[in-house]
Amino acid sequence: MVKDLRTQAVDMKLHRLPKLQAAQWNLTHAQPFFPSLEQLFKTETLASMADYGIKLPEEVESVVDATHIKTTKGQTLEVHRKTTMILSPFKTMKGEYSAPGLPKPAETAKSYSEQMQSPHTAAYVGALASSALSTSECPHFPRVYGVYAAMATKHEVNISDDYEELCDRKWFVDNIGKTFELRLRGEGGEGFTHTRGQRMAVQVGEDIDLDAEDVTVEAVPEPTVEDVVEEYELPSDSEYSEESESDDEDVYDILSCDCSERSEDEEDDESAGDDEFAWATFTEVPVVTTVMEKCEGTFYELMKTTDDAQKHTAWVAQIVFALAYAQRNFGFIHNDLHGNNVMYVPTAEEFLFYRHHGVTYRVPTYGILMKIIDFDRATFSVKLTGMKEPRFFMSSQFKPDEEAGGQYNIEPFHDSKSPRIALNPSFDLARFASSMFWDMFPEGPTQKTDHPLFEMFKHWTTLPDGSSVVFRKKGDNHDRYHGFDLYKAITRYLKESAVPRKEISKFNQYVTTVSPTTKVLVIGE
């Protein structure tokens, strides 16, 4: 196992839950069972397995309305539901799965069954990670009140980031109104255009001749879960040079940016990157919904509304301690940690206490308790009490033909034709720093500032040769890698720069001998 990714035994249990009426959530046939549970629990002797799910400290008793539940402890709570399609939204839009309940060609049936039944399907992995982290002692993950697989009578997926590329696919235009409905922000009003490239909205029925080739990728067979033990050899400096050495790309290639200057269009694209403007709506599709506590806002929003460096540092310290705990107990890597995947709730606790190798840390909250969310791309292990070996779970998003393909190359999605790329415990903090740096320090790496996070973020994104995974060597305030190439570069090249447990020492200003006033979160003794 990668040395900084460890597991500790956890006391999770399975129990039978009553049927949930979830029509107000546009769900039918809701059940707490999903296939990942069979990897953890002995289920052979259980009747009506669909009625069994993970036992949580406080659970959904009934649905009050779209945003509220009544719990088994008698509380009426406002909640957030993260709902994820089990089948690939894009393959569903393309019509690859055929009509539900009807016979399918052998390859289609194989792909459909694999996605529905694999313990590594992204929707299941996200739900299991949420449940496991919720039942742990760490307060920095949302409380979960229930997980349900169900049929959604209506489900909407944000496709804004992919809209421009999708519009270049003939099947996308052809299938509007057939396999999905398309909704655009401002549709029906004047002046709506696509913010990236100013693309006009596609009109249903419009004759468009798109010179695009549809490529059918063979389904990846269901592999066995094996231990992730092999490290990827650190490449030479030439392997992460500024220029690509080959035009013959594959999913594992990494391309750095070699354009001469930062264009106005690029800046506009980045500023608009978080805008939501396009959604695909599906009917009667299988989903997993995770019912969790409602958070108040994101870390990104906090940075935009608060300029206090002491607060920023204390809140980032919470994130570092949370990740160190998750790596120590679940071998957990989030794999998509950015400013909007860290949220917060208000807290009355003035300080939080952590203990690492006998040292106690007293971190001020300033009224904010950070919560890390969204685990559909996670990799982690769960070891139940009494288990000899942990069970490893890896999101299906890491299949070579899926959205995170090329970041790792390990079981259960190992491609024997390409070098092995192991899990990287530095990934989360490096990705987090790269996502927030320009917003917090817009003048770039040469900015004059005494903000404690400035040098810390630069360290987390520095390669062994002293260059940055974020900035080009030219020092021109231009991103070195764009899009998913950044994810692959962090995984491949940053090995020791941002391991959470090793970064705890950077927060020695919080070391204390004061007796804890709240429960201490133990990271490692």
Where are these regions (language model features)?
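Helical subdomain adjoining the active site within ATP-dependent kinase catalytic cores
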Residues: M1-S36, K42-E44, A404-E525
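ATP-binding glycine-rich phosphate-binding loop
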Residues: L17-G95
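Core residues of folded domains in eukaryotic genome-function proteins
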Residues: D65, Q75-V79, C138-R143, P286-T290, ...
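Conserved beta-strand elements of beta-rich interaction domains across eukaryotes
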Residues: G74, T84-S88, A149-A152, C295-G297, ...
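The N-lobe alphaC helix and its flanking beta3-alphaC-beta4 segment of protein kinase-like domains
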Residues: S88-T135
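Conserved structural core of kinase catalytic domains
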Residues: F90-G101, P139-K311, V382-E389
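Conserved kinase catalytic-core helix
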Residues: A129-L133, T306-H334, G339, A348-E349
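Catalytic activation segment of kinase domains across protein kinase-like and atypical kinase folds
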Residues: Y232-L234, E242, D248, D253-L255, ...
